[in-house]
Amino acid sequence: MMSSSSPTQLASLRDMGIYEPFQQIVGWGNVFKSDINDHSPNTATSSIIQVDPRIDDHNNNIKINYDSSHNQIEAEQPSSNDNQDDDGRIHDKMKRRLAQNREAARKSRLRKKAYVQQLEESRLKLSQLEQELEKVKQQGHLGPSGSINTGIASFEMEYSHWLQEQSRRVSELRTALQSHISDIELKMLVESCLNHYANLFQMKSDAAKADVFYLISGMWRTSTERFFQWIGGFRPSELLNVVMPYLQPLTDQQILEVRNLQQSSQQAEDALSQGIDKLQQSLAESIVIDAVIESTHYPTHMAAAIENLQALEGFVNQADHLRQQTLQQMAKILTTRQSARGLLALGEYLHRLRALSSLWAARPQEPT
């Protein structure tokens, strides 16, 4: 009896593509056994099976497919070098991200610092405005009839705007000098600053008509500014001493002209100061009333006193005229850039005087 793996079955297995070589060996063994038992040469001869060449081709195809699949799997698996490259790229990306975070944090700290400084400046300005408002409330700028002096109230509003504009112009000068703009552009800024001071002198002239004592007493200025005040403003000679260190180098001709300007300014200051002293003396004499003649000469003496007070307005205007002339003469003596540096120094000086007053007012008070 034949084994279960007959030639017909082998052929069907080959057609299905699941032929097993071990099954072929088993089949051959059964055939040889049948030949020995039957002792029939015809049977033995007919039992020899010719191997189909397609079997070898099929086996070769299986081996080739296996090798190619194995090679493909190996190719798909990343090598150690690729892993190292990926790790390096990830590490570089993390370093860049950390650097970006540090830079963002640094910029955030700078913005916070600038914001805190701005708040502090605003606090100082608010404190100064509160002090000025309180001073206005206490004095009221009242005239003899108790009405508000509109001329002085208008001057205080205009002067507040003038200070804001002054701060902006000083900042423009600083930026222009740092950026090295052309002399033509810089000259326009210098002339604009000089005109800005001229506007202040005109404002003061109008205020002097409303109340010269308010103006000459310095009630419109801070406490530190009043400490340096001379006839309603700064001394021209003081101005020259402040800006001189920022004008170097000067030519010999410039040095000579600046010295002459200092000398003439000092002489004009002395003349105005002497005039103020004589005015005070004359005013005091005009109101000294002898008890014997009080009833008959009182109106005459008071009229003379009023005339003397009216002359005080002229002294304030002359002092402002001297200040304006000193600024203009300095601009003529100096180059454009020297003038810009001088105006910048003057603006910073006046600004720091006002800031010093605010700091003094905001200082901690010792308990009494």
Curated annotation (Swiss-Prot):
Taxonomic superkingdom: Eukaryota
Location of the protein in the cell: Nucleus
Biological process, per Gene Ontology: defense response to bacterium; DNA-templated transcription
Tagged with keyword Transcription: yes
Biased composition (Polar residues): 70-82
Pfam families, per database record: bZIP_1, DOG1
Presence of keyword Coiled coil: yes
Spans through the membrane: none
Ranges where the record places region Basic motif: 93-113
PROSITE patterns named among the record's database cross-references: BZIP (PS50217), BZIP_BASIC (PS00036), DOG1 (PS51806)
Molecular function, one GO term: DNA-binding transcription factor activity
Disulfide bonds: none
Domain DOG1 as annotated: residue spans: 152-363
Record region (Disordered): 70-89
Stretch list, region Leucine-zipper: 119-133
Domain bZIP as annotated: residue spans: 91-151
Keywords attached to this entry: Activator, Coiled coil, DNA-binding, Nucleus, Transcription, Transcription regulation
GO cellular component, one term: nucleus
Family: Belongs to the bZIP family.
Protein's job: Transcriptional activator that binds specifically to the DNA sequence 5'-TGACG-3'. Recognizes ocs elements like the as-1 motif of the cauliflower mosaic virus 35S promoter. Binding to the as-1-like cis elements mediate auxin- and salicylic acid-inducible transcription. May be involved in the induction of the systemic acquired resistance (SAR) via its interaction with NPR1.
Subunit comment: Binds DNA as a dimer. Interacts with NPR1 and NPR4. Interacts with GRXC7/ROXY1.
Name of protein: Transcription factor TGA7
Organism: Arabidopsis thaliana (Mouse-ear cress)
